[in-house]
Amino acid sequence: MSRYKSEQTAYSPLKKKYVPMWQLDTNIMTVTHFNADTQIEESKTYTADFIRYHLHFSDSHCPDRLRRLVNEGRIIQYLDDMERKVSEAIPRQVGLWKQTDSCYQKAVLSGDVKKILGLGNCFVFMAREVVFECMVYI
């Protein structure tokens, strides 16, 4: 995959050269920011599988969007928002299905724990598929 670097640079006395203010490495899902005020390089690594899927998808289908987000210094905000929204959307969808699915409700009423857990897991995987299609692979 790719490594994106911002056009804006700052001098790093530690490295004794100009370094990009922002960098994104889609392989290791890490954003690096060189803070010119403190002269410190700060990194944030993402671990969610859907962030990896989104970065790899975006890298191959719309690299200009990633390049723009890195250049504008908005890549961390963008990925944090995606992480939060996807993490909230999956359980919200699962909850909706649990409220409306008659098989699940019958299992709850009868106390069939095996069926409750099985349907709950099924709902999670179904929700991931739907949410990923709508929010990750765009």
Can you name each region flagged by the protein language model?
Residues 1-2, 28-36, 121, 129:
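Long, non-globular targeting/processing and low-complexity regions
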Residues 2-19:
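Ligand/cofactor pocket segment of small-molecule handling proteins
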Residues 54-111:
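Aromatic-anchored, charged helix-turn/loop surface patch used as a conserved interaction hotspot
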Residues 99-138:
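C-terminal charged interaction modules
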Residues 18-74:
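Short N-terminal mixed-charge amphipathic segments
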Residues 1, 45-48, 103-107:
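General structural signal for secondary-structure boundaries
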